[in-house]
């Protein structure tokens, strides 16, 4: 039997929000998981504590030099059962991110067990409505109070939970407008593009704001060397349907290896679609569109799962894909993926991990 994580009970519980108006990342549960690290003890003192502000040194290295990584995954409730979706993949990826920033890796099994116990404590916070979930945010940051530029000797890991509404506000997929960024770059090979580090997202905000001002929802990034090849969207990996084939940029060290991406590729192949992972130039996409060969575009990520792209703008040209409607392949993949997540469809892959009652 797994060892029980220490539990610090709060005096009173919060009033839970109206599940009809959850939005994303606006509400937080009563408790969080906390783990500390120092060079002598390693990772230690895992405990479930009340969600609350905490003290940190003004000289904490994470504030100055950016040693901070995070993850995002979800828990679902179906017929009273609470499950996590592919949490092992998230903890493998957080270790890859930690290693890249010279931060101490975590015990994946111990952390998964701690997460299960946290979600069990908070199972009443898991919404059960269509498309709703409990968003899970693990993150690690340097806490040692010293201004020397070196790897910190002290860190904190927290996991916070946020009940979240349906991304689209219902069952119908809604197409997004994407701006292809040709001035700024997100990442270069040899850098940290493959890692889920805080700085990647900070560096993307200016381009994202500029795109929003022009009426676009997100930015599609090109490679950082030639600014010719498509890489990823701000919060999603990207897929194209060309001549009936599902095409996505190959992982090259500057693209985040999305867990949803990985799952979608496997589902697409099992549904009988031909999948290609390769370099995709922006010129190829617009040429394929002109020939009538580019029929669908969609993004994949934890928040939206699948987000159809209806409009794509590059330089002074804007194209509308599939009359701004989700394509058949996009819809099929979305329905299958979310069906497995929610428990409505059989999970032959073992992706759903049950949260036991401790």
UniProtKB/Swiss-Prot annotation:
It comes from the Bacteria. Its cofactor is pyridoxal 5'-phosphate. The modification N6-(pyridoxal phosphate)lysine is found at residue 196. Pathway: Amino-acid biosynthesis; L-isoleucine biosynthesis; L-isoleucine from 2-oxobutanoate: step 4/4; Amino-acid biosynthesis; L-leucine biosynthesis; L-leucine from 3-methyl-2-oxobutanoate: step 4/4; Amino-acid biosynthesis; L-valine biosynthesis; L-valine from pyruvate: step 4/4. The keyword Transferase applies. GO terms for biological process: isoleucine biosynthetic process; L-leucine biosynthetic process; L-valine biosynthetic process. It is an enzyme of class 2 (transferase). One of its GO terms (molecular function) is L-leucine-2-oxoglutarate transaminase activity. PROSITE patterns: AA_TRANSFER_CLASS_4. CDD domains: BCAT_beta_family. The keyword Transferase applies. Its EC number is 2.6.1.42. Keywords: Amino-acid biosynthesis, Aminotransferase, Branched-chain amino acid biosynthesis, Pyridoxal phosphate, Transferase. Pfam families: Aminotran_4. InterPro entries: Aminotrans_IV (IPR001544), Aminotrans_IV_CS (IPR018300), Aminotransferase-like (IPR036038), B_amino_transII (IPR005786), BCAT-like_C (IPR043132), BCAT-like_N (IPR043131), BCAT_family (IPR033939). It catalyses: L-leucine + 2-oxoglutarate = 4-methyl-2-oxopentanoate + L-glutamate; L-isoleucine + 2-oxoglutarate = (S)-3-methyl-2-oxopentanoate + L-glutamate; L-valine + 2-oxoglutarate = 3-methyl-2-oxobutanoate + L-glutamate. Acts on leucine, isoleucine and valine. PANTHER family: BRANCHED-CHAIN-AMINO-ACID AMINOTRANSFERASE (PTHR11825:SF44), SUBGROUP IIII AMINOTRANSFERASE (PTHR11825). Belongs to the class-IV pyridoxal-phosphate-dependent aminotransferase family. This is Probable branched-chain-amino-acid aminotransferase. The lineage of its organism: Bacteria, Bacillati, Bacillota, Bacilli, Bacillales. The gene is ilvE.
């Amino acid at each position: 039997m797994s060892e029980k994580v220490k539990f610090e009970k709060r005096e009173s519980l919060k009033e839970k929000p109206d599940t009809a108006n959850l939005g994303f990342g606006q509400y937080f549960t009563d408790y969080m998981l906390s783990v500390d690290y120092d060079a002598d003890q390693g990772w230690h003192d895992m405990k479930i504590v009340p969600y609350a502000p905490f003290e940190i040194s003004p000289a904490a290295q994470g504030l100055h030099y950016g040693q901070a990584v995070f993850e995002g995954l979800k828990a679902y409730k179906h017929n009273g059962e609470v499950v996590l979706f592919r949490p092992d993949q998230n903890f493998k990826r957080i270790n890859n991110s930690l290693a890249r920033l010279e931060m101490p890796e975590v015990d994946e099994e111990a952390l998964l067990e701690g997460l299960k116990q946290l979600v069990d404590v908070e199972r009443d916070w898991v919404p059960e409505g269509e498309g709703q979930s409990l968003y899970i945010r693990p993150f690690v940051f340097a806490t040692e109070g010293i201004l020397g530029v070196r790897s910190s000797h002290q860190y904190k890991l927290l996991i916070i939970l946020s009940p979240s509404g349906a991304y689209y506000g219902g069952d119908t997929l809604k197409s997004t407008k994407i701006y292809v960024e040709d001035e700024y770059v997100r990442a270069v090979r040899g850098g940290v593009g493959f890692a889920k580090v805080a700085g990647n997202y900070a560096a993307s905000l200016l381009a994202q704001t500029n795109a929003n001002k022009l009426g676009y929802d997100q930015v599609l990034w090109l490679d950082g060397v030639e600014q010719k090849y498509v890489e990823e969207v701000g919060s999603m990996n990207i897929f194209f349907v060309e001549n009936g084939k599902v095409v996505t940029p190959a992982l090259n060290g500057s693209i985040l290896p999305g867990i949803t991406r990985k799952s979608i590729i496997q589902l697409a192949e099992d549904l009988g679609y031909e999948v290609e992972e390769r370099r995709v130039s922006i010129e190829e996409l617009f040429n394929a569109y002109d020939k009538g060969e580019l029929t669908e575009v969609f993004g994949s990520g934890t928040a939206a799962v699948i987000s159809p792209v209806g409009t794509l703008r590059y330089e002074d040209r804007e194209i509308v894909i599939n009359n701004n409607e989700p394509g058949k392949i996009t819809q099929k993949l979305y329905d299958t993926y979310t069906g497995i997540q929610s428990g409505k469809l059989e999970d032959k892959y073992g992706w759903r991990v049950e949260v036991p009652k401790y």
